[in-house]
Design a protein with these regions (language model features):
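Helix-terminus/linker motif at the lipid-water interface of multi-pass membrane proteins
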Residues: 60-93, 111, 149-158, 217-219
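Alpha-helical transmembrane segments and their helix-entry boundary regions
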Residues: 5-6, 81, 194-198, 224-226
């Protein structure tokens, strides 16, 4: 049953952890850490906690928030829930691209910040987010146009398909806003400014998505409550754009300008 599946998952995680440590100890000399730690670096631990605690808190509260939104979906009946579940498989197509771009953004930001390449850092955020937006916009439009045959691969029940199509039309055409917003958030996380992104993530969920879902349900539009998802994406995008007006980003821009001026001075010919 459920308890057995949970126990099996826990055992698998511990075995995976133990196997990974043993493999690393045997094959990589630079990773000869003990099975149990004997000490720690206070400065390094503080740096890890500074980034990890806000992100962990964010993920925990975000999961609780999703339960609250799911409760609204459940109020609409099993047919509606089934439709949303099926639609989620189609929107997951765009989700693959978003995950890929977001992973690239956080690595790109961290590497270039560490290397002091501020000019590339500044250009990269524009290039990555634009690429993510264009790709997901195309995916969203194509999947929306052909959503009924795509959704028909998972269910043939007319009522379920109607609910799934409604979900798709409310979410997929606007998925590009989530792609741009999430890439910006990943990029900013890569620079270490996790407090800002944590506040934004909690804001769009607890101040936008959840209230909007319950308001739509209270007004009798519960079967369109998925509109709260697209609304939260748009608000998140605007909020993340606001980061680039903050003093933190201003410092990076000044460093990029100083680096650019230095490179220009080195490459300009000397007049005799």
């Amino acid at each position: 049953g459920v308890a057995g599946a949970a126990l099996a998952t826990t055992i698998a995680l511990y075995l995976s952890w133990l196997t990974s440590i043993l493999y690393a100890r045997r094959n990589y000399e630079g990773l000869q850490f003990p099975l149990l730690p004997h000490g720690y670096d206070k400065a390094q631990l503080a740096a890890i906690l500074k980034v990890g605690v806000p992100l962990g808190l964010n993920n925990s509260l975000y999961s609780v928030g999703h339960v609250a939104v799911q409760a609204v979906y459940n109020m609409q009946g099993s047919v509606f829930v089934a439709g949303c579940s099926i639609a989620g498989r189609v929107t997951g197509i765009a989700g693959i691209a978003i995950t890929s771009f977001s992973s690239a953004a956080v690595v790109f930001a961290g590497q270039n910040l560490g290397a002091g390449n501020y000019r590339r850092l500044q250009r990269g955020v524009v290039q990555i987010t634009c690429a993510a937006g264009v790709v997901t916009l195309l995916i969203g439009l194509v999947a929306t146009v052909f959503c009924r045959p795509l959704l028909g691969l998972f269910s043939s029940a007319p009522a379920v398909l109607d609910a799934a199509v409604r979900y798709t039309w409310w979410v997929l055409p606007f998925i590009w806003t989530y792609a741009v917003f999430n890439c910006m958030m990943s990029f900013v996380n890569g620079t270490g400014a996790v407090k800002y992104t944590t506040v934004v993530n909690l804001l769009i969920l607890w101040a936008v998505r959840i209230p909007a879902a319950y308001i739509l349900h209270a007004l009798g539009y519960g079967t369109s409550s998925m509109a709260c998802v697209s609304l939260s994406y748009a608000v998140g995008l605007v909020a993340m754009l606001g980061y680039f007006l903050t003093p933190e980003w201003g410092k990076l821009r000044r460093k990029a300008k100083e680096l650019g001026d230095a490179v220009t001075a080195e490459t300009e010919p000397t007049l005799i």
